[in-house]
Amino acid sequence: MYVQLKIINFYKTHQKPNLRIVYFFFFFGLETFFSIINPNDLTFFNYVIGVNNLDLTKKPNSSVDELIYFFDYLDSCWSSLMKSSNQNSKPIPWGLLLSNLIRWYDSNTIEALINNIL
């Protein structure tokens, strides 16, 4: 519940509402496109990314953490939606991939990037 509230707050603090619409359709469109092309070969991405050990009870202390939570939440929602619609499809977990990429970069660099974009 806390994560969902933080996502809502993250959306409310956005200065550019058009940007989040673009992000939404871009990432969901990519995942849908690749899962339609060849859903059987996408298990490789799940193997490479590995298991995400994010503690959902931990409170995010920066906008970088909020972004990670946001992508993780998106990934879990979209994956469950795809699994319920087609049992054979294995969508690429773009949200999880992006959140792990964010973790690999320096927090201060991403913080500055977010502030410049927003």
From Swiss-Prot:
It is a single-pass membrane protein. It is found in: Membrane. Its main location: membrane. It comes from the Eukaryota. The chain crosses the membrane at residues 21-38. Keywords: Membrane, Transmembrane, Transmembrane helix. GO terms for cellular component: membrane. This is Putative uncharacterized protein DDB_G0287527. It comes from Dictyostelium discoideum (Social amoeba).
